[in-house]
Amino acid sequence: PNDASAREALGLATDIGGYAIMVGGTNGAHLTSFSLVDIASHGRGVALMNPYYTVFFAPAIQDQLRVVGRIYKKYGYMEEDLDALSGRELGEAVAKAMMALGRKLNFPTTLAELPGFTQAHIDRALVAAKNPQLDMKLKNMPVPLDASSVDEYMGPILQAAATGDLSLIKNMK
């Protein structure tokens, strides 16, 4: 209660979470987090995955990324001119700011940093995403997917999250 910096960070996280909720549809990070429950809490899994799905969703959520990006910029987590960026470049800038905040908080920014993480977690997430009962969750994402596109698009997102290499993420054309 007496740590003003921590209180400010919590407020910032709350704002960012609120903006994430305002994005229509389902977030892939939320869907993926259920396959990580043996190594990360639900919230931790979502927070870790958000930067990677941000890059994938970027062309469809540019207005929201500019709003969130201004918050990151205000607090020194990004230097880029948000108005000069669009699409994937905007998504990468915001994703890097998300990861910078995570690193400042000593929060893992890659799956490989989670004790117990293995390729089996990625495999489990890909299998789970193809479950017919989750079809509407895939279709409701800002960039809709279906079971036939999970490996092609979600697979690289998860590989990027394992390594921190945003260049692995493929955007739909």
Q: Residue locations for each model-derived region?
A:
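C-terminal charged capping/lid subdomain of soluble metabolic enzymes
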Residues: 76-173
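Active-site segments that bind and position negatively charged phosphate/pyrophosphate groups
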Residues: 1-97
